[in-house]
Amino acid sequence: MKQRNVNRVALIGAGSVGSSYAFALLNQSITEELVIIDLNENKAMGDAMDLNHGKVFAPNPTKTWYGTYSDCKDADIVCICAGANQKPGETRLDLVEKNLRIFKGIVEEIMASGFDGIFLIATNPVDILTYATWKFSGLPKERIIGSGTILDTGRFRFLLGEYFDIAPANVHAYIIGEHGDTELPVWSHADIGGISITELIKRNPEYTMKDLDELFINVRDAAYQIIEKKGATFYGIAMGLARITKAILNNENSVLTVSTYLDGEYGTEDVYMGVPAVVNRNGIREIVELTLNEQERQQFKHSANVLKEILAPNFKEQ
């Protein structure tokens, strides 16, 4: 990997997610340089101008400009938010063919620049497109990261916090699997202050597993609800992307639920899925393999199989 004294993030795609991500980066002063690249040059230029005008209010100034793929050469992270959007009633997997075509061209342009950093993928279906980026780029698998279930996990912790009247930061619970309809909650490892969720239910009759099952459905279907109401989701995922970016650039070794390549972990292989992983300056340091109960293992296996069925016709063995 290329080592520079100045951190640079290249953003591909200045749509709602990309622009919100850029806004989050500047507000938290996560990177020293941000270059915005979009087919619509005027949109990228406008975003760069708008963000620069607010730099005086940020903790530290971030050099921000609109650029071209050649600017990816010196980037530490390229975050791809470009692609076709999910429409009302459309699943994330419905976007596969459209976005695979788009991604092949984007990744080839980025690699032609001499880029040798870390890819961060946000475009849906994120697990499929993260795998595609790995295949198209030829970079090591640990340097290709998808947003995975980081937002689902955030939604999960928020709703659990509301239910138990506890700050979400003190709720420890994960959503794993596909970022989509087959994702699953890991109830067997969910706790608040070291007390398991199942134990809390036993102690207090006002809490029920039926309520929590409904809570998970609200987590899983949150995107559909938001899309129906406002057309797209972008603030939450942008903040999740900013969190991953911070973990990488600061070499945090933080555990985040991101889409990463499985090579035997969780009983599956040759697929990118959302699982807890240690994230640092080199990308994915290691996967945190939770001990799942039998029901969770079966659900995870089903989620993996759904993704593999989508991948199979598009990435045949060479």
UniProtKB/Swiss-Prot annotation:
What catalytic reaction does the record list? (S)-lactate + NAD(+) = pyruvate + NADH + H(+)
Positions bound to substrate: Q86, R92, N124, P125, V126, D127, D152, T153, G154, R155, T233
User: What keywords sit in the KW lines?
Assistant: Allosteric enzyme, Cytoplasm, NAD, Oxidoreductase, Phosphoprotein
| Activity regulation comment | Allosterically activated by fructose 1,6-bisphosphate (FBP).
Q: Biological process GO annotation list?
A: glycolytic process; lactate metabolic process
| PROSITE patterns reported in the protein's UniProt record | L_LDH
Q: Which GO terms describe its molecular function?
A: L-lactate dehydrogenase activity
> EC number(s) of the enzyme?
1.1.1.27
Looking up NCBIfam families in the UniProt record yields: L-LDH-NAD, PRK00066.1, PRK06223.1
What protein name is recorded for this chain? L-lactate dehydrogenase 1
Q: What is the organism of origin for this protein?
A: Peribacillus psychrosaccharolyticus (Bacillus psychrosaccharolyticus)
